[in-house]
């Protein structure tokens, strides 16, 4: 018999999930909502998510066809430097740092037998960031970049309403905050590089709509089904987090509303911040420089 049987594999994936921690999982968490309410919410949200995906794809593909004749609809891109295309030192250092941070987080998941939590959206976005830093600029990287720009709202929620009651290992809590902070560092860095990492215009919400539909479809289909089968509260699809301000039987309805609003606007605010931060930093640096004295 193989040493790693099917049962040991399941134990390796979620055997360390302790239902005694509030909001972590277990039978009580899985039964937090009645099956009728869960089914009704899932049907409504999945239908809306599919409509959002179809509408967004239709407009994006139409814009792509219209853009073949010219680039007038594209935003102004950062002036490309002569060394554009070469791996910069800063990009490589950021990639190494992110890989080390995420590697430690993965190690914690293996050590605590909670590897299943790597399916949570923040970890998936971190993997997308590693790909963007490692992959040369290309059309595929541009698509992933535009999608992840509108998937960063989870990092804000994780920082404002942290769920850290299960992080008991040394430095596990610190890695939690560092990883979620890095979810903002990488996009802002890529925005400053420009080129293939140029977002859509601020008035264009099609990519935000597509990201919203994909995130809700992922949550109410894959994460919810897997959570019900394993009784693991993946991204709070079974029961609300202990820090949820909308704790109660309608927490998913509230979440669908405020997360739709956040997904549609949060990425735009990050883009706007990156546009303002660059000139602001340059202005502050110019202020710090002492004026040169003219010698007659």
UniProtKB/Swiss-Prot annotation:
Transmembrane portions of the chain: 40-60, 92-112, 125-145, 149-169, 171-191, 209-229, 261-281
GO BP annotation list: positive regulation of ferroptosis
Localization in the cell: Membrane
Record-linked Pfam families: TMEM164
Biased composition annotated in UniProt, kind: Polar residues: 71-80
Reactions catalysed according to its record: 1-(1Z-octadecenyl)-sn-glycero-3-phosphoethanolamine + 1-octadecanoyl-2-(5Z,8Z,11Z,14Z-eicosatetraenoyl)-sn-glycero-3-phosphocholine = 1-(1Z-octadecenyl)-2-(5Z,8Z,11Z,14Z- eicosatetraenoyl)-sn-glycero-3-phosphoethanolamine + 1-octadecanoyl-sn-glycero-3-phosphocholine
InterPro entries the UniProt entry points to: TMEM164
Gene Ontology annotations for the cellular component aspect, listed alphabetically: membrane
Keyword list, A-Z: Membrane, Transmembrane, Transmembrane helix
Superkingdom: Eukaryota
Region annotation (Disordered) ranges: 66-85
Membrane topology: Multi-pass membrane protein
Protein family (similarity comment): Belongs to the TMEM164 family.
Function: Positive regulator of ferroptosis.
PANTHER family, alphabetized: TRANSMEMBRANE PROTEIN 164
Protein name stated in the entry: Transmembrane protein 164
Organism expressing this protein natively: Mus musculus (Mouse)
Source organism phylogeny: Eukaryota, Metazoa, Chordata, Craniata, Vertebrata
């Amino acid at each position: 018999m193989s040493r790693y049987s099917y049962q040991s594999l399941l134990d390796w994936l979620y055997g360390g999930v302790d239902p005694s921690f509030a909001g972590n999982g277990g039978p009580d968490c899985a039964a937090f909502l009645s099956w009728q309410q869960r089914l009704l919410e899932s049907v409504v949200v999945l239908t809306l998510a599919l409509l959002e995906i179809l509408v967004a794809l239709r407009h994006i593909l139409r814009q792509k066809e219209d853009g073949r004749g010219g680039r007038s609809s594209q935003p102004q891109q950062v002036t490309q430097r002569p060394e554009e295309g070469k791996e910069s030192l800063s990009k490589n250092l950021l990639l190494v740092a992110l890989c080390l941070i995420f590697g430690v987080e993965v190690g914690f998941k293996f050590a605590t037998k909670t590897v299943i939590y790597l399916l949570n959206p923040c970890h998936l976005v971190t993997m997308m960031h590693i790909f963007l830093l490692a992959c040369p600029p290309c059309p595929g990287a541009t698509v992933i970049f535009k999608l992840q720009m509108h998937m960063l709202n989870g990092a804000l929620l994780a920082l404002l309403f942290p769920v850290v009651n299960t992080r008991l290992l040394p430095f596990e809590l610190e890695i939690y905050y560092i990883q979620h902070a890095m979810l903002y560092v990488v996009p802002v860095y890529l925005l400053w590089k420009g080129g293939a990492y140029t977002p859509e215009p601020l008035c264009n919400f099609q990519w935000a709509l597509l990201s919203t539909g994909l995130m809700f479809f992922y949550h109410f289909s894959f994460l919810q089904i897997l959570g019900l089968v394993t009784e693991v509260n993946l991204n709070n699809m079974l029961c609300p987090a202990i820090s949820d301000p909308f704790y109660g039987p309608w927490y998913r309805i509230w979440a669908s509303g405020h997360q739709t609003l956040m997904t549609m606007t949060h990425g735009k605010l990050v883009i706007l911040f990156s546009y303002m931060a660059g000139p602001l930093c340059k202005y502050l640096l110019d202020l710090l420089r002492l004026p040169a004295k003219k010698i007659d």
